[in-house]
Regions:
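Non-catalytic C-terminal accessory modules of carbohydrate-active enzymes
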Residues: 3-5, 9-20, 25-107
Length: 107
C-alpha cells in the first residue's frame, strides 16, 4: 500500500465520513468487513489515530437507544466490536492469541 505513511494517509481519508453507505469508498462500520480497519493504524505505527477513530465511531454511531447500532448485529458482531473497543482491545488477527491495544473507555 506504499509504506506506513501512505497507509496512514489513506486511512485518514477513509475515515473522513462514517457510515456513508455500503457502496461508498468511505468507512461503513455497519458491516463486519470494516470492523478491524481502525486497528490497521496500530500496524502502521499510528496507535493514537486508532484510538481517535475508535472513540469517534463509538460516540457517533452507537447509542443505548433502540436502533443504536450502525448496522446489522449479525450474531452479535457489532455488539462485540463495541465491548472489545470499550475495553481498549481488539482481536485483530483471527486465530492468533493476543489483541491490538487501543484506549479503554473506562478507568
Amino acid at each position: 500500500m506504499g509504506g506506513k505513511e501512505r497507509v496512514t494517509t489513506r486511512l485518514d481519508r477513509f475515515f473522513t465520513t462514517l457510515n456513508s453507505g455500503m457502496r461508498s469508498e468511505m468507512a461503513y462500520m455497519g458491516n463486519e468487513p470494516s470492523e478491524g480497519i481502525p486497528w490497521v493504524y496500530d500496524f502502521a505505527g499510528a496507535p493514537a489515530r486508532t484510538q481517535k477513530v475508535v472513540r469517534r465511531i463509538q460516540d457517533e454511531l452507537f447509542s443505548a437507544r433502540p436502533g443504536g447500532l450502525p448496522g446489522n448485529d449479525d450474531a452479535g458482531s457489532l455488539s462485540s466490536w463495541y465491548v472489545f473497543s470499550a475495553l481498549g482491545l481488539y482481536p485483530a488477527i483471527p486465530g492468533v492469541a493476543g489483541f491490538a491495544v487501543g484506549s479503554p473507555m473506562y478507568r
